Amino acid sequence: MGRSRWIGHAAFARFIDDYQAAGIEADPPPQELVELIADAPRVFASELKRSIDSARALLPYAELVSTPLFTEAPLASPRLPALRMKAPAWAVVARVAWHGGFKPGIESYGQSKQRARQAAPVLIEEAEQNGIAVLVAHGYFNAILGRTLRRRGWRRVSGAHRARFWNTVVYERDTAIAPPPGRSATRRVPAG
């Protein structure tokens, strides 16, 4: 089902399921991204196929740590039978509804924020130990995680949280706010 077709709520629910099960397209990752993370000993990913496939494409020889901790913030299709929209419009409606408390059998916004609070220390520890932490995950959860990292003394130095393939966001510890324990150098945490 394409993103440009007008669909109802049931078709959007199927679209979500299909997207969650999908892998990645054959396009290789951008060379500048591959070079940015080349020295990483491991890559963190969600347990979804597209995240794992992307992680392997980026760092084929690094240790892969796949965990539901980094899974995308969930979407559910609101039952609006009279409405037909394109999938991206449905995604906006579903996300707004989710923020408003619509969570039929899925993780709530508050639970996603809590998961981000659990995920941030994993990346911070990796960055402090190895000088880099690489996460290949999903746009909306990455944005929630980014807010959590900023609250913990990290700052975004490049990129923006966008819903695009191979989107890259780089964080460094903001030494003016929270110097690294026993270190003065910044540590980068690319969040895919």
Where are the regions a protein language model picked out?
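Active-site-proximal alpha-helix that buttresses catalytic centers in soluble enzyme cores
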Residues: 1-69, 86-96, 100, 104-117, ...
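Domain-level recognition of soluble alpha/beta enzyme cores
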Residues: 11-13, 150-179
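Glycine-rich phosphate-binding loop signature in dinucleotide/nucleotide-binding domains
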Residues: 37-38, 123-131
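Beta-strand elements within well-structured catalytic alpha/beta cores of enzymes
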Residues: 44-45, 127, 131-140, 144
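Short, well-ordered alpha-helical microsegments
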Residues: 51-53, 142-145
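Short, acidic/turn-prone active-site loops that include or flank metal/cofactor-
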Residues: 68-73, 160-164
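Signature for phosphate-centric chemistry
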Residues: 69-85
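A polyampholytic, Gly/Pro-enriched intrinsically disordered region
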Residues: 83-98, 176-192
